[in-house]
Amino acid sequence: MKKEWMALAAVGAILPGAALAATAAEMQALADKSGCFSCHGMQSKLVGPGFAEVAARYKGDSQAAASLAKKIREGGKGAWGRIPMPPHGNLGEDDARKLAEWVLGGG
């Protein structure tokens, strides 16, 4: 009986990690499909800042996810230099929010 409980505990410990990995893969696929990687690298700047830079700049800002989601959908200029970020209005609000949270969480 003790072995069965230990096996269940091990499975329970593994499943949340598997769910997170699937979510990370889904978010990376959404970012790719949405064209994010045309301008942004995970760690480094391409045209726009790398996601790690974005996460570092907004760390501790409780409004960051909402403002970043808005910037994803509506575009922006001046926050990271002279090159504007084009709007992605075809991306739904929910997906924009998920992408923003993913970027802020370190991608």
What are these regions (language model features)?
Residues 47-58, 73-100:
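Axial heme c-ligation environment in periplasmic c-type cytochrome domains
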Residues 40, 73, 103-104:
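Protein kinase-like catalytic domain
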Residues 34-42, 99:
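The canonical Cys-X-X-Cys-His
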Residues 16-31, 57-59:
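Electrostatic cytochrome c docking/interface patches
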